[in-house]
Amino acid sequence: MTANTAYTASSHEATTNSFSRRALIGGTAALGAVGLLSACGNGSASSEKTKAAGAGAKIEDLYNINAQDVNSLKKGGTLRLPAGSIGPNFNFYTQSGNTSDNVNVMSTISQAGMWNLDFDGTYKLNTNFGVSFEHSKKDDKIQVAVKLNPKAVFNDGTPITYKALQSTWNIFKSLDNGYNIVTSGIYEFVESVEKGDDDYSAIVTFSKPYYPLQSLFSEILHPALEDVELFNNGFVDAPHPEYWAGPFTLADKGWDSTAKTFSVVPNDKWWDTKPLLDKIVFTQMESSAARAAFKNDEIDAIGASTSSTYAEVKNIAGTELRKGTRLYAGGLDINPRRVKDAALRKAIFVGTNREALAKIQFQGLPYEETIPGSMIHMPFSPYYQDSYPTPNNSVSEAQKILEAAGYTKNGDYYEKDGVKAGCAVVVFGDDPTTKGKAQTFTQQMKDVGIEIRIDQHADSEFATILGNWDYDISFSGYSVSTPDATAGTKQFYYSENNEGIGSKEIDALIDAMTLIEDDKERNLACNEIEKKHMAEFAFLGTITNGPDFVMVKKNLANYGPRLYKSMDWTAVGWMNS
């Protein structure tokens, strides 16, 4: 078998992400989830406005982690970080666990996968787990030869062999196997995963092509997770460190479900570069509590992407602002499982004044952006196109949609078959910015003739409510975890991922898109799918990308906005001066 393309180990990369799915993020920036940060500037906070990166932006201008040689940093110390919601389901491969906070917290202890991303989103072998990745064609089918690092083991001592690759495939290959997965991604196109020359090699044969191939085994799961009950429910309030592998592991009694703290320490079973830090402690906090904690020197970093947080923390001595654009898209998430009438969803899309909501979001921040129009591409991507339906921001056009669908006005609101046109917007946390958006949105919809109720919840309930689809409308969105939109397009717009909501026509377009080998052609096809889906089904809409402003202790190194680059927790540490 002659390989057409080979990726071979040449240098050690410390961490990996899962690139086959995109994680839920709240409507405001995560409190300390640097896994989702991008573009950055230096120095303390200033009033100079930052403009969102657009077409032609230079990648080197879009990140700053205060990069320092690890040999120049202190050995030891503790890093204290806030999180809006930790758990309750620590299996972040499930729908109920797939939140940015969970992904960020668990990334310290769970890094098994073949790939890392560089700043610009290019793939690099994660040599802690993968030695080589070669693909070729045999009998007109794509085959991938994988070689694993024989040093790699899960924390319970289970070696990471071809059996782990088989288990990963078995779990993700179908949405119909009982696993509560987010998306099947590349795995449903795999025909077989077989043992290669030894236990640390495997031959993967595809039933039909899928691109990019580098999304294969971006995650490697412990064979024990093939137990459906364990996969779906076994990680609720139980991180199970024995099933993961990474440079850190859960400390003794490291998950305190009462205090809502998640503490990790260096993993003595880790075979590669040892971490600098002695401990990382994540604490679940509401926004107001996090602001107070940062001012009182109880945490070392805080997201400052809302005006209230930014105003409170921007001038604290010994800190600096690292700022940029989030790898995030969204802000108008209408749950089609609850808001079932497509006409009502379309009217909400068309009647929403996105500019007014974005103005509230960014008021008081030194940041400005053009309203984005894509869930799958960032505006600085060469593939970016505005997919949001037109016309929009129009009360009259929204009313026409309702009336064409059989709604009639009765007082302030439309109704149909005796049922008022309305639903609830769920709001998390106590940040005034989010509450202001909800109140403005409610008035916008009243102008259209749709009644919106505000459903208030704590930040800590975010994962449970959204993971269980227990909401009508949310200001949340998703991470834009890679520059390639293939997996995101399938996750968002394939009907099987949305309980059948969609169309056979769009599903066929997605199936055809995954067969396109040329990256540009495939990603442009993703745009056409997104435009069609938004226009017809209207349940994932864009209001902002937004900044990722993070206030940090000045002497914190190798931590901050890093664009697409995989997080290297081993290199995070404290400078000597």
Sequence positions of predicted segments:
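Gly/Pro-rich hinge or "lid" segments in bacterial periplasmic/extracellular proteins
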Residues: 100, 108, 119-120, 218-275, ...
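Aromatic- and charge-enriched surface segment that lines or borders ligand/interaction sites
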Residues: 132-178, 203, 340
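Ligand-site clamp/hinge motif
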Residues: 266-312, 451, 458-459
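Append "and occasionally in soluble cytosolic enzymes with long acidic Gly/Pro-rich linkers
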Residues: 263-265, 340-443, 528, 576
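Surface-exposed binding/hinge segments that line
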Residues: 74, 181-230
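N-terminal export leaders
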Residues: 20-25
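N-terminal lobe/hinge region of extracytoplasmic solute-binding protein
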Residues: 79-137, 170, 243
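Detector for C-terminal structural segments
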Residues: 2, 8-17, 30-31, 37, ...
